[in-house]
Amino acid sequence: MGLPWYRVHTVVLNDPGRLISVHIMHTALVAGWAGSMALYELAVFDPSDPVLDPMWRQGMFVIPFMTRLGITNSWGGWSITGGTVTDPGIWSYEGVAGSHIVFSGLCFLAAIWHWVYWDLEIFCDERTGKPSLDLPKIFGIHLFLSGVACFGFGAFHVTGLYGPGIWVSDPYGLTGKVQSVNPAWGVEGFDPFVPGGIASHHIAAGTLGILAGLFHLSVRPPQRLYKGLRMGNIETVLSSSIAAVFFAAFVVAGTMWYGSATTPIELFGPTRYQWDQGYFQQEIYRRVSAGLAENQSLSEAWSKIPEKLAFYDYIGNNPAKGGLFRAGSMDNGDGIAVGWLGHPIFRDKEGRELFVRRMPTFFETFPVVLIDGDGIVRADVPFRRAESKYSVEQVGVTVEFYGGELNGVSYSDPATVKKYARRAQLGEIFELDRATLKSDGVFRSSPRGWFTFGHASFALLFFFGHIWHGSRTLFRDVFAGIDPDLDSQVEFGAFQKLGDPTTRRQAV
């Protein structure tokens, strides 16, 4: 049977045993990739600085997902929070990776077994002796089992009743840790940033899935609905399964890109909207103002800003700054962050405090403009010095640092002032090591960006797949000349006109 490459899956169309086999093999590949990728990431991951070199700066992709579900320790003796551990237990990062690889191997063997022993009695219709699947019943079984898993995850794993809980943090990504979560049954449970909604929604969805599964196991579909939706055709299952997958992919692309309780910034990095809205900058200024209100000096107030919070307020951590096709981690772009230099405050010769206008997300270059508290331009770095009126030299701009490594240091020479004004466009100023990884200075995206791009792209592709296979199954008789009510097996290539027994080919 000579099939073109895009039609090879027809070999399992009327073969339930081998249909199971190829799905088990697919599971083996997925689990094997996950375990192998986890081991690779653990081999290259540096856990020494969770503040300035967290997992998302290093381009880790599967470690954040393990951490989000409650894994924090390694058999190497380190913890994701920066401490050391003596007894990580079996469910460490390596334990999870190993279990996926073992599971992959078992699935591989099961797939081979089902490929060899494909003609099982369980697949045969007692009345006809031909292979057939009771698809509505199988749907009910799968719905019931997935409902049990969903309910169990929400009621036991997330709540900590039997499990570790999940990663929970504050709105600014400073105090994250794994903890148990109580279900949120009120209106607050619909807030995407409330962790309690994860528990309550899994419990509710799981309960619904269990009830719906029992319904589909006990109630047969009406004949007209069965025929109208082609419920006896395996391609109907394919079409509706693809619909479920692309819908889920669109949802998680949104929760990842826009942020939610399921995608903490400590594990996946900040979102672009936090830069656009000055989210961390506002919190930093609020803390400094609160310190000044308590009679702290400007230097003391800025020195109490957590380095972690200052690091979030840096454009290099914005996932929208990296191009989609710039390979590598953020550390390979602008370098490994070594330390916060402090907050620069610029002043003109009249003593006015000046603020550098920050670079918007989608600019690669941006004019250096310094404005006062009223938004009036007071200084800039001109493109044409001959026509300048507000140059740093003319206005007499100076800069002084508060907090960080340069706390109390001031500069008045124009070249240095302009250097720090340019860097202040990018948010808080950090010392970056570009030598270690031979970083090229071009911003990269974080795993948040990669995940969103991948899932949005595949969701679109799978949407078209759903339309394609849904159309094929609904209009099979039109497209292929096969009667939709035809129950007999069709041997592809046996007839000149597919499904028409009067056009049987002659054996050569």
From Swiss-Prot:
One of the components of the core complex of photosystem II (PSII). It binds chlorophyll and helps catalyze the primary light-induced photochemical processes of PSII. PSII is a light-driven water:plastoquinone oxidoreductase, using light energy to abstract electrons from H(2)O, generating O(2) and a proton gradient subsequently used for ATP formation. GO terms for cellular component: chloroplast thylakoid membrane; photosystem II. The keyword Transmembrane helix applies. Binds multiple chlorophylls. PSII binds additional chlorophylls, carotenoids and specific lipids. Pfam families: PSII (PF00421). InterPro entries: PS_antenna-like (IPR000932), PS_II_antenna-like_sf (IPR036001), PSII_PsbB (IPR017486). It is a multi-pass membrane protein. PSII is composed of 1 copy each of membrane proteins PsbA, PsbB, PsbC, PsbD, PsbE, PsbF, PsbH, PsbI, PsbJ, PsbK, PsbL, PsbM, PsbT, PsbX, PsbY, PsbZ, Psb30/Ycf12, at least 3 peripheral proteins of the oxygen-evolving complex and a large number of cofactors. It forms dimeric complexes. This is Photosystem II CP47 reaction center protein. It comes from the Eukaryota. It comes from Fagopyrum esculentum subsp. ancestrale (Wild buckwheat). GO terms for molecular function: chlorophyll binding; electron transporter, transferring electrons within the cyclic electron transport pathway of photosynthesis activity. Its main location: plastid. The chain crosses the membrane at residues 21-36, 101-115, 140-156, 203-218, 237-252, 457-472. GO terms for biological process: photosynthetic electron transport in photosystem II. Belongs to the PsbB/PsbC family. PsbB subfamily. It is found in: Plastid, Chloroplast thylakoid membrane. Keywords: Chlorophyll, Chloroplast, Chromophore, Membrane, Photosynthesis, Photosystem II, Plastid, Thylakoid, Transmembrane, Transmembrane helix.
